[in-house]
Amino acid sequence: MTGRLSSVVSPKVGYWLLVALSAVPAVYLLFAVQYSAITVPFWDHTELIHWIADWREGNFHVSSLWAPHNHTRPLVYRLVMLMNAVATDWDVRSEYIYLYLSIYGTFACFVWLARRLIGEANAVFPVTLLSVSLILFSPVGHNNHWWSMMFQLDATNFFIALSFLLVFTRPEIWSCHVVAAVSCWLAAFTLTNGFFAFVAIIITFQLSATKFTRPDRFAVFWVINLLVASACYLPGMQMESSSTHPSALELLEFSLTYLGAPLGGLLWFPYRSMFQLPMSIAVNLICGSILLVTCAALSLDALPRLRKRHPAAMVLFGFAGFAMLSAVATGWARATFDEYGVANGNASRYTIFGSYLLLGQVYYVGAALVQGWWGEQAHSILARRVVFVLAGFFACAAFVSYGRAWRVYADAHEFNRSLAQTYVWGLDPVPEDRFIHPRPEAVAYLKRQLQLLELGPYGNRAYVKAQSPVGSFSKPVYLSAARTVRQRFVATDDGLKRLSLKFVTPNGKATTGVVRWQLSEVGSQEPLARGDVEAGGARDWATMTLRLPYVVASRGRTYELALSGTGEDSTALGLPLYEPVESSGQPVLLSDDGDAQHGRFVMELTTEYAK
């Protein structure tokens, strides 16, 4: 590639043109995600509402983040997503920040790896960088781009890449092994593939040991980490996903397809829409077979260097081992999972780990060309030209696939628009609910919690306010255990969603306890909503908003708000009462020690209606 460029431009200009070209896939990914991102809760990602609701209601337990899901314990994923949801009222758009950090962080690891193995002051570096960039940001893995839940895979990929970078480029430094082990633990408790990274590192270090039959000290360190992590991970885990497992032939076909998909998809992009799973495995199976053959040939060449723990050889063996373990383990669970069978190996999301087989060979070949490992100068020049021609063909085909892939991101963009429109106020089922989640009861729970807590697509919505008219301020009433304060009002519009009122603190810093509130429709036995207000956290004359479930047909209906407290009047929160004016509604009903009496005052109440 650089040979052809040098006939038109200088080698230095050609070098920097290739480096600049390496940034194109990264920019492409940025625009693709910004355009196609799903920005509302969708499918398995909706399960996060359970943790968010528990957090908001004060029922959250850290141990719940440990619960298994689909053969994994995604502790890191849940922790990051929950903290972000709490901070942003579950604005799904903000989750793509972490997806970007994971993907671009992985690219930074791979760039650093290229610098360590190949160096920068040569023509091979920009060719390697371009190849790595095309593979890492590949639209073949589009499923890991337009859905923020795939942060789980992208973060795992970053932790694994960091671990490999540290231990394979500095194999004799203990501090690197310790940091890499921490990174592998994080990967394992994000997705199960992190355990395959443990195994790949163990095998690579044992193969490179001075005496193969004697346990290597670094391999022992990683074995201990693997055993301890497994002891924490496996108890209580249900590993069976299918009543049947694949035959040896089916497992082989799936694994070869899985390993060949990153290359085959870039040579000719096979996806036509965001959810399409290509049924033909021929191209990817052939690519996977070729990659295994070339990997075997390169491994034979690298074996003497592996014994010396040369970083390029360790990368080749470690990357290939990880990819193969991922392929076989995934195939065991998914090759006969449904009617798609071994075609599941074409799934877009799997290419993120299958690509390590190709990446390991890219790095080793690059290092071999720079180090001149392949014979005399004439043979080395010939090898370099062959590699550059193949790299040029690969880059041209890949950029064509990048262009053809935009239709998938456009499809995701349209799907997101349709999906967002299903989040309308109210809990009545709509046909499009099936796009949110296949189980209607899960959709009903999700919408009920989102509307009640005003999260996600129901956050920052417009509200129409209606304030009850009041006269001059009269006095506060203490909300203690001694009394209950009730007031009835008539809703002026449909879509009742909030009530706002003010509290006062006549007891100052001595204010403690809890104020309990309940809203009911007059004539109904069941309350519409109830909740607590921490009296100690209230500020004098500050407005307090009570969030309600969305009430579709509230216009003209009469409701009653009841407020009660705990403790004595000397520590109670106060509720300001006002002189009534015409049309201000029914007076406050005070219940003192069980004796009900009508007062001649009203509370200042603002009703808000969602539109």
Go through each PLM region and give its residues:
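Intrinsically disordered, polar/acidic, low-complexity terminal segments
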Residues: L5-H71, A85-T128, W174, I203-F205, ...
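Transmembrane alpha-helix segments characteristic
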Residues: P25, V127-I135, W222-S230, R307-T336
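Short hydrophobic/aromatic helix or loop-helix immediately within or flanking a transmembrane segment
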Residues: S64-D89, E253-G265
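Aromatic- and kink-enriched transmembrane "portal" helix at the membrane-lumen/periplasm boundary
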Residues: F125-F159
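Membrane-interface transmembrane helices that cradle and orient dolichyl/undecaprenyl
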Residues: I160-H177
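Membrane-interface alpha helices of multi-pass inner-membrane proteins
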Residues: C176-I203
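Hydrophobic alpha-helical membrane-interfacial segments at the cytosolic entry of transmembrane helices
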Residues: T213-L234, F317, V389-L390
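Beta-sheet-rich sandwich/jelly-roll-like modules and their strand-loop junctions
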Residues: A462-G523, G531-T558, A562-K611
